[in-house]
Curated annotation (Swiss-Prot):
HAMAP family: Ribosomal_bS16. GO terms for molecular function: structural constituent of ribosome. This is Small ribosomal subunit protein bS16c. Keywords: Chloroplast, Plastid, Ribonucleoprotein, Ribosomal protein. It comes from Jasminum nudiflorum (Winter jasmine). NCBIfam families: S16 (TIGR00002). It is found in: Plastid, Chloroplast.
């Protein structure tokens, strides 16, 4: 199963995160299938590849709680087709 989750980058006391599509059995810092976005919690900046995110969501990927909140804030959940299920 594929999940959209955060992968930690940056340095000590200055974390930034990549939003990646990754297999659930992989470790947090493991090899990702594809990078689909970027999140900086200190500056509160996000950069999302909407096309790639929608592709993985249509294929059945599940976002983690934090990624789900980021996607809702960016209003990506409104771009899902009506017949597609919403986030859990």
């Amino acid at each position: 199963m594929i999940k959209l989750r955060l992968k930690r980058c940056g340095r000590k006391q200055r974390a930034v995160y990549q939003i990646v599509a990754i297999d659930v059995r992989s470790p947090r810092e493991g090899k990702a299938l594809r990078k689909v976005g970027f999140y900086d919690p200190i500056k509160n900046q996000t950069d999302l590849n909407v096309r790639a995110i929608l592709y993985f969501l249509e294929k059945g990927a599940q976002p983690t709680g934090t990624v789900q909140d980021i996607l809702k804030k960016a209003e990506i959940d409104k771009e899902l087709r009506p017949n597609q299920t919403k986030f859990n």
